[in-house]
Design a protein with these regions (language model features):
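Generic structural signal for hydrophobic core residues of well-folded globular domains
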Residues: 69-76, 189, 193
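Short Lys/Arg-enriched alpha/beta "domain-start" segment
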Residues: 1-35, 64, 71-130
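Short, charged/polar micro-motifs that form catalytic or ligand-binding hotspots
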Residues: 58, 106, 110, 138, ...
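A recognition module on extended beta-rich or small alphabeta surfaces enriched in W/G with H and D/E
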Residues: 170-201
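Conserved binding-pocket/active-site segment within a compact domain
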Residues: 115-175
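Amphipathic, interaction-prone secondary-structure segments
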Residues: 24-51, 130-156
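Intrinsically disordered, low-complexity regulatory segments enriched in Ser/Thr/Pro
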Residues: 45-70, 155-180
Length: 201
């Protein structure tokens, strides 16, 4: 059932992409377009997306690939604001986004926040994250797509408090992906940082 549902979503994404001028997509999504394919970087991997059949090389997990196609379809070129929001502050994000916010907090407290900082840095680096100064003990910026950054902020545990943390998005994020897609992006990043395989197929 889930596979049929996924195939249907993929077919819709392909149809929608075919309705745009490719040069228009490239400009709004911040990608390159040449020889019938888009080229872009996603979480440290440079991939090409062939417009004719939406195949992606090198291959990505199916939900990663579908979300990237949605990004190319929905991107409207809105500039990044530099102001961050939580997933629950996303347009229509109260339920789905709030769930991701709580899940991220739990994963930081249980898994990521108890790692030695160098190990967390190594895991973030494997996804191409850039470490940034911030008000948290640890802050990394992941680029899911050229105009879709995600920040992980972690406060490590001490004698008084357990570790805490959150994933954040730029305020412009709803111009590029729906809340459902945003939750997929957050889940993909958390999965890869913890070694879980929920979204890896």
């Amino acid at each position: 059932m889930e596979n049929r549902q996924f195939e249907a979503m993929l077919a819709v994404a392909q149809e929608r992409l075919a309705q745009h001028a490719p040069e228009d997509i490239a400009e709004k999504a911040g990608t390159q377009y040449a020889d019938g394919s888009f080229s872009l970087k996603t979480l440290e991997q440079t991939v090409t997306v062939r417009l004719s059949d939406c195949t992606i090389q090198p291959p990505l997990s199916k939900w990663h690939a579908l979300t990237l196609l949605h990004y190319l379809d929905l991107a409207d070129g809105t500039p990044l604001t530099g102001r961050t929001i939580t997933f629950s502050q996303y347009k229509d994000g109260l339920v789905r986004g709030g769930g991701l916010d709580r899940n991220a907090e739990l994963i930081v407290r249980r898994d990521l926040g108890i790692l030695p900082p160098e190990e967390l840095e190594r895991r973030c680096g494997s996804l191409g994250a850039e470490l940034l100064p911030s008000n948290a003990d640890f802050c990394a910026r992941f680029d899911f797509a050229p105009r879709y950054p995600v920040w992980l902020k972690v406060w490590f545990s001490d004698e008084e408090f357990p570790a805490s943390g959150r994933l954040l998005l730029d305020e412009s994020a709803p111009h590029y992906l729906t809340i459902e897609d945003a939750v997929t992006v957050g889940s993909l990043i958390l999965d890869q940082l913890t070694g879980a395989q929920h979204w890896a197929v």
